[in-house]
Amino acid sequence: MKKTIILLIINTLFILLTSAQSSNQCNEWMKEIADTLPLCQLSIPGTHDSGALDGGEAFQTQDLTLEEQLNLGVRVFDIRLKACENHQLGVYHSIVFQDLYWETDVLPLFTTFLEQHPSETLIVMLKKEGGNGDDFSRLLSQNLNDTLHTRFFIPHFKEDILLGECRGKILFIHRDQLLEKFPGAQCHGWKDNATCLVTLKDPHGNETILSVEDEYQFAELSHAKDKVATIMRHLESAKHNHTNSHKWHITYASATALPEAGPQSFATIVNAQLAQEIHAQTHRPYGIVMIDFAGTTDGQTIIKNLINSNFQK
């Protein structure tokens, strides 16, 4: 009896230790990557509409909180904001408020994570999601220029920015051109529901080319196979981003066919196939890959394989 109890205790401790080690590896997976590697030559997992846990079939895109996503290894976040009557920026997906505020819930979470894990870097994509543009610009500008936060921000974007220059900091990519003074880069030429080349401009006007696959609107769920094919074509393009190239790639694996099928229905099919297609054994720069429902088995497999691809020879 005593022997059985001892074995149970040992097994429990082993499971807890293994779990803790795995969690720590996900929290600091960038730690073992060389400072000299350009950020654009990494495979980086991200989430589409990262804060959208509410909204049902039409609007929910995630099943994990932002903190849970961070701990899983997600390093790119797609945050949609709307200026609210309480003079804060609320996180929205379309018309659905996600019960989160940028100033009090999101940015403090990101900066605290970076303080605790200074080997990591976050890429945060910001987009206005409805509401008054002037209020949005004013509130976001005030927040991003507050000296309380600016030490965590990468002020100027450049195409060949190195991981070592980004550790412990946030690189902002602004989908809108609404701020005169901003950290990071603004997007110019991002077409809706398309694969396209986008120009990233920093505050000094320096330009970088970003290849974006964001074809998300389909007529019916049976077209999920077409979405997978589109994703794989774009990932193949990223694969040929040789060491002397500084072209950036963002691939969105998210899609919808409303009113027939929403993001979760597509994610069930797309993530399963994508998890099989992204092979951790083959070293290649996949670029940034944005997925829905990161907490599912297939979602976690995609994230794990993207991370592991950075360490394969």
What is the meaning of each model-derived region?
Residues L81, G130-N132, T297:
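A cross-family signal for N-terminal binding/gating loops and helix N-caps
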